[in-house]
């Protein structure tokens, strides 16, 4: 096999993006227009080095010069730059994705992994449960979630928000194992009454690989391990609008596929 520069196909694009200086130039140009001398100065590069790399970007159609002689991203270049953050996120978290899957997510979700780029990674079951509790407690309009497991300790936290008028919508896996005492607790807090009032709505899917919980302010996502089960030891937590939209789109996608909630399918702990 030859290691020479590819002349056509997507390989030629990846080759142009392979240089750190060229990537930095594209990132800078996505923010504003530059003259080459300004760009070289901000990136601490020599004029010779900057000129050589910029010539490549211009020849590849990613960058052009405007009437004032300033460097600008072409429409094609701007589109390419918008896609780079998805690769950046996957690269920065490559150790995680070496032993975690994406749970069979449709391509339209995988192609938007850039939505995760500003997320915080939360480690440990206790830390994750605490974040869930805070998310529930701070909800003012709604809570939506897709769950494979039922945390008994948080049911009362959710119910207190529902009592305050927060709408709660959730999707359970039909093979979820529910903790002992859940049925009695739901009866105690009047869960059926919440459902009849339309404050709580629920549906069911055969299984859940990717979990999410989100409200109008925050969101979190848990991906599955190599067994296909959500890893409750690592969670992506974020506040960005794009990330919350990703969570909402995943929820809506699963909600449309989900069937009627059937309590009898749930496995109860002995």
Region spans (language model):
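Short beta->alpha linker loops
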Residues: 44, 68, 127, 149, ...
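PLD/PLD-like phosphodiesterase catalytic module centered on the HKD motif
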Residues: 2-31, 38, 43, 49, ...
């Amino acid at each position: 096999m030859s290691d020479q520069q590819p002349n056509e196909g997507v390989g030629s694009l990846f080759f142009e993006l392979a240089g750190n200086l060229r990537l930095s130039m594209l990132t800078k140009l996505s923010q504003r227009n530059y003259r080459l001398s300004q760009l070289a100065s901000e990136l601490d590069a020599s004029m010779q080095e900057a000129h050589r790399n910029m010539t490549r970007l211009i020849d590849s159609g990613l960058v052009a010069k405007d009437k004032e002689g300033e460097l600008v991203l072409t429409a094609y270049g701007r589109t390419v730059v918008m896609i780079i953050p998805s690769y950046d996120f996957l690269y920065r978290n490559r150790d995680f994705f070496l032993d975690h899957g994406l749970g069979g997510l449709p391509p339209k979700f995988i192609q938007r992994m850039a939505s995760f780029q500003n997320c915080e990674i939360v480690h440990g079951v206790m830390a994750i449960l605490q974040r869930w509790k805070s998310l529930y407690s701070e909800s003012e309009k709604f809570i939506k979630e897709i769950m494979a497991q039922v945390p008994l300790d948080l049911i009362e936290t959710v119910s207190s928000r529902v009592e305050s008028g927060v709408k709660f919508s959730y999707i359970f896996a039909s093979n979820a194992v529910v903790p002992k005492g859940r049925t009695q607790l739901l009866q105690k807090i009047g869960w059926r009454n919440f459902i009849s009032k339309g404050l709580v709505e629920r549906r069911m899917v055969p299984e859940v690989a990717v979990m999410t919980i989100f409200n109008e302010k925050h969101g979190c996502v848990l991906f599955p391990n190599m067994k296909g089960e959500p890893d409750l030891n690592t969670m992506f937590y974020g506040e960005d609008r794009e990330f919350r939209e990703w969570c909402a789109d995943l929820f809506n996608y699963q909600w449309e596929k989900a069937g009627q909630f059937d309590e009898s399918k749930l496995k109860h702990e002995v």
